[in-house]
Amino acid sequence: ESVPRALDEPETESGPASDPLLPTGGAPGTAGAMMGVDGGTGGIMAGIGGEGAGLSAANTMGAEASGLDAYADHATELASIAEFASYGKLLTTSPVNAPVQLTESETEYIVTAYKHVFAEHIVLQYNVTNTLAEIVLEDVVVVVGGLMEAGLEEEFILPIPCLSSATPSGKVYVSIRRDPSLPFPLATLTNTLRFVSKEVDPSSGEPEPEGYQDEYQTEELDVGVADFLQPVELDFAMTWDTLPASASETFALTALESLDASCSTLVELLGMQALGGTDVPANPSVHTMMLAGLLACPGGLETVLARVRMMHQPSEGVTMELSVRAPSDEACLFILSAIA
């Protein structure tokens, strides 16, 4: 089927064209992935957030500053750990401001996670809290599954020696090597908290000398496209034509009920910066959003751009054309894979 005229207008020489025109009729184009309400997990359906997802134009600057501060804090902390000293510059941390929740907050063991990407490594940081005062956990590690399937290799684990009522929280680090032949690995990882459990003697307040090996399964941890991207502000029109590789695909997103929802979802899913307030549609029917990011490639950070032309029809949902410019075809296809 043909792509709607609203999504098929030509680019200008200096960059993207202006907002598309309303279509005169006909069904939306179906080139690319067709993703409806029952489209399954992964891709854009996995990235749909609740109210307030994404960044609005009103709070973009504040959120960006907050993100940069948090990124700097992560970089400083990781640089202070001797085992990571040779890893070089931290390229991205995801999520930057608040970790992924891998357990419910009311459980006996609370686990959250950050994903830190370096040029040749990924470091998984697991924040672990023991809420049981009558139990001491020793030699706490996280056993990560699903690495081999993604072309990743675990190098070592930095455990937590002890979690007790005096020091209930700590951090486990799992160092993973990136395969140079698979520069952008995507994975769904299983996480098993493993430790020696010792009961505390109520009379002495000391742990029993003997304990037993125990483990606790948490939620899965996804490594996705956004984990390799860092938002960046730049001049979109000037940069667009300087990037040599390009790719474009059209998607019918029948599960998204508005252009506002589409913008919020894409900002969250791609991990890129919406430029010039383009994450806030002025027209409920047609809109163009421009995004910029730095992609964590094996050689360092590389600039990537995305232009999203969207059209909403109440009977069809949102039809979207995603066009990407990047230094390589591989990088372009990687960005598109966030939706496909």
Label every PLM stretch briefly.
Residues 2-340:
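A structural signal for beta-rich interaction modules in eukaryotic proteins
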